[in-house]
């Protein structure tokens, strides 16, 4: 019977406790002149994630999106959204937890951030902006590879010193 209880405690669990907007900003530095020009924007998306441990098995993950639209040389708008979530995560290995915080949680948060960006852009009276889905699993794998490469280079540099 105790064995069954231990197995239940070890089973991975993932619960979303809260999803919220942590920070939001929309700027149109060249309005109203930007509305008088032909609309041929160049849109750039920057994103970042970070996480911090709030308590045992409870983590905050923050997905930051910055969307910059330039019309020619002028900035048409700058939109920044920090979408956050509080997640209770138990029963994972360190590697699985890192993947959850770096890829799975941002996947949960992205639709909320995308909607916030779209709403802000519309309220700024710009044409609708539909952000494409982001493959956070691939971005996390790339991040892990970069860290491993940097770790492999560090001992080599120390040996040469």
UniProtKB/Swiss-Prot annotation:
It comes from the Bacteria. SUPFAM superfamilies: SecB-like (SSF54611). It is found in: Cytoplasm. The keyword Cytoplasm applies. Keywords: Chaperone, Cytoplasm, Protein transport, Translocation, Transport. InterPro entries: SecB, SecB-like_sf. One of the proteins required for the normal export of preproteins out of the cell cytoplasm. It is a molecular chaperone that binds to a subset of precursor proteins, maintaining them in a translocation-competent state. It also specifically binds to its receptor SecA. This is Protein-export protein SecB. It comes from Shewanella piezotolerans (strain WP3 / JCM 13877). The gene is secB.
